[in-house]
């Protein structure tokens, strides 16, 4: 195996598939499996899911640039591991300060089934949503590639839409007390956007949420 050639290739790409590793290493089948296991064992490769990896070298280079660049890289990986998807829910709410606790998972919305991937660089958690609610995300850039993350309003919509409440009283108690949500973070545009998302959803539960948010003068 030409490890120098491999490292040169790995430092150019944000992730690599097992198939492309086989082409670089000129290995296949059990021989390829052997080398993949070896590269994982010596920390050259970090597995994201079956057949998909990143290089420790690339991850360390990005992390050294800045925390902001590392965060965008993780969002890019979250978008790539399970497609289509966009980062949302607790991760965005925590990042914005609306949730007081840090999110230790990169949480995303997907059109595919709910799934969780635990890796050495973090946990990537995906929740399914109906196709008609798959919108409300912003397009940003990472190394010339698009990354998708929800606006604060859409992350809030996703968060409440996918959460189970037994009654209006439980919704009210959560948004005013137990949820510990810092509603002061929302600006006028966030509030309008959230109200618009809820109104157009035609979800009875979300209409109840909007009624309570307005009654409590939150939006």
Annotate each predicted stretch with a short phrase.
Residues 137-219:
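Hydrophobic alpha-helical interaction segments
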Residues 117, 122-149:
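A contiguous pocket-lining binding segment that forms or flanks enzyme active sites
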Residues 47-52, 57, 70-120, 126-130:
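Short gly/ser-rich loop at a beta-strand->alpha-helix junction or flexible surface loop bordering the NTP-binding
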Residues 1-81:
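Short beta-edge/loop segments at beta->alpha junctions of small alpha/beta modules
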Residues 28, 99-100, 204:
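Short coil/loop linkers at secondary-structure junctions
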Residues 26, 40, 97, 161-165:
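Hydrophobic/aromatic-lined pockets within catalytic cores
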Residues 18, 89, 152-153:
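Structural motif detector for alpha-helix initiation sites
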Residues 15, 86, 150:
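Short aromatic/basic micro-patch
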């Amino acid at each position: 195996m030409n490890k120098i050639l491999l490292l040169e290739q790995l430092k150019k790409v944000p992730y690599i598939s097992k198939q492309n590793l086989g082409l670089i290493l000129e290995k296949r089948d059990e021989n390829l499996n052997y080398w993949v296991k070896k590269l994982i064992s010596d920390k050259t490769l970090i597995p994201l899911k079956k057949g998909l990896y990143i290089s420790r070298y690339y991850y360390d280079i990005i992390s050294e640039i800045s925390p902001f660049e590392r965060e965008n890289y993780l969002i890019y990986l979250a978008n790539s591991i399970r497609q289509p998807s966009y980062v949302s829910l607790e991760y965005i709410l925590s990042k914005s300060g609306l949730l007081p606790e840090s999110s230790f998972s990169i949480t995303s919305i997907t059109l595919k089934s709910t799934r969780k991937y635990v890796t050495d660089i973090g946990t990537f958690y995906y929740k399914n949503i109906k196709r008609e609610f798959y919108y409300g995300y912003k397009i940003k850039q990472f190394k010339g590639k698009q990354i998708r993350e929800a606006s604060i309003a859409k992350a809030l919509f996703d968060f409440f839409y996918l959460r189970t409440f037994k009654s209006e009283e439980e919704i009210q108690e959560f948004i005013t007390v137990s949820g510990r949500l810092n509603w002061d973070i929302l600006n006028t545009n966030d509030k309008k956007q959230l109200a618009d998302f809820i109104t157009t959803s035609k979800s009875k539960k979300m209409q109840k949420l909007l009624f309570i948010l307005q009654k409590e003068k939150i939006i």
